[in-house]
C-alpha cells in the first residue's frame, strides 16, 4: 500500500496550525526543526515569519501523530551545525532515540558530508528534495511551465523518478516540494499516480498561509484552503484503504 508523508521544514509559526489541522483529519506530519529559529537566537530564513516556540514543538511531539526531526541549528548544511541542532533537539525531547534530518534548502553536499558520516553520528535518516538524474536540468523548466499553466501530467513526469526512489538505499529520503503556484489538483494527481504505480509519496511543505499572512506570496508557501483539501483527500483515501498516512521515520523503520 502507498504510504504518504507530509514533511514540514523550519518549524515556522503557521506550520503549528497546519499540523494541528492535519491531525484533526488523522493525517500524520513530520516537523523538521531549525533549533536556532525556535530559540530566537538566529533570524529566520523566512523573513517576517517567526518560528514556533519550544513549547509548541513539544506539544506537537506529544500529539502522537507528529514526528520531530532535525533541520540543523541555524539552517545551514555545515555538519557541526547539523549535529548541534540534533543534540539540542534530543535534549528538548528528552530522548535517546535516533532522529532524522532534513537538509536546509536540500543543498547538502554528499561529497563533503557522505551518508556514512550521518550514520556514524546516530542520525536515523537524511532527507533532501527530489531525486536527481540526467534529466533534472530539463525538468526544472518543465516544472516552472507546469506550475504557471496548471499542467498535471508534465509536472508528474518530472517527479516520477522521485516517487520511485522515495527511500534510497534504506536511508536517504527524497520528496516532492509543494510550491506556491502548485494547484491542489496537481498535488492530487501526483498522489493518485503514486497509488497507481504502488510507490510511496513524500511531500515537502513550508508555510501554510491564510489571507493576509506575511508570506502568502512566497514561493515556498501554500494556501490554507489547498492544504485542508489535501488533508481531506488523504483522509478519504485512507478510509478507502488506498493509502496510509505515515511519518518520515516509518519509511525507514518498516
Question: What is each PLM-predicted segment?
Answer:
Residues 1, 135-175, 218:
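Membrane-proximal basic amphipathic "stem/tether" segments
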Residues 1-14:
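Boundary/entry segment of secreted carbohydrate-active catalytic domains
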Residues 6-7, 70, 80, 162-169, ...:
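Glycan-processing catalytic domains of CAZymes
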Residues 10-13, 48-56, 223-228:
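Aromatic- and glycine-enriched glycan-recognition loops and surfaces
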Residues 15, 53, 78, 82, ...:
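Aromatic/hydrophobic pocket-lining residues that form the small-molecule binding cavity
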Residues 17-21, 113-117, 190:
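A short acidic, amphipathic alpha-helical/loop segment
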Residues 24, 90-93, 125-128, 187-196, ...:
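C-terminal domain-boundary segment and adjacent tail
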Residues 25-147, 200, 204-216, 251:
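Metal-dependent polysaccharide deacetylase catalytic core of the NodB/CE4 family, i.e.
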Amino acid at each position: 500500500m502507498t504510504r504518504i508523508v507530509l514533511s514540514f521544514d523550519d518549524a515556522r509559526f503557521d506550520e503549528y496550525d497546519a499540523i494541528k489541522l492535519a491531525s484533526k483529519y488523522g493525517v500524520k506530519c513530520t516537523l523538521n526543526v531549525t533549533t536556532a529559529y525556535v530559540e530566537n537566537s538566529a533570524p529566520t530564513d523566512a523573513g517576517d515569519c517567526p518560528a514556533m516556540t519550544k513549547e509548541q514543538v513539544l506539544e506537537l511531539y506529544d500529539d502522537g501523530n507528529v514526528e520531530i526531526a532535525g533541520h540543523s541549528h541555524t539552517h545551514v548544511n555545515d555538519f557541526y551545525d547539523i549535529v548541534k541542532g540534533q543534540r539540542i533537539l534530543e535534549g528538548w525531547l528528552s530522548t535517546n532515540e535516533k532522529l532524522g534530518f532534513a537538509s536546509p534548502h536540500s543543498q547538502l553536499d554528499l561529497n563533503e558530508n557522505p551518508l556514512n558520516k550521518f550514520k556514524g553520528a546516530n542520525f536515523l535518516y537524511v532527507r533532501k528534495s527530489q531525486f536527481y538524474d540526467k534529466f533534472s536540468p530539463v525538468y526544472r523548466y518543465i516544472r516552472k511551465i507546469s506550475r504557471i499553466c496548471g499542467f498535471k501530467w508534465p509536472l508528474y513526469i518530472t517527479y516520477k523518478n522521485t516517487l520511485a526512489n522515495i527511500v534510497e538505499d534504506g536511508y536517504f529520503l527524497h520528496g516532492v516540494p509543494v510550491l506556491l503556484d502548485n494547484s491542489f489538483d496537481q498535488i492530487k494527481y501526483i498522489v493518485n499516480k503514486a497509488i497507481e504505480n504502488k510507490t510511496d509519496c513524500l511531500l515537502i511543505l513550508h508555510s501554510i498561509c491564510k489571507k493576509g499572512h506575511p508570506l502568502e506570496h512566497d514561493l515556498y508557501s501554500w494556501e490554507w484552503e489547498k492544504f485542508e483539501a489535501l488533508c481531506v483527500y488523504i483522509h478519504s483515501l485512507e478510509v478507502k484503504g488506498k493509502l496510509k498516512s505515515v511519518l518520515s521515520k516509518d519509511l525507514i523503520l518498516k
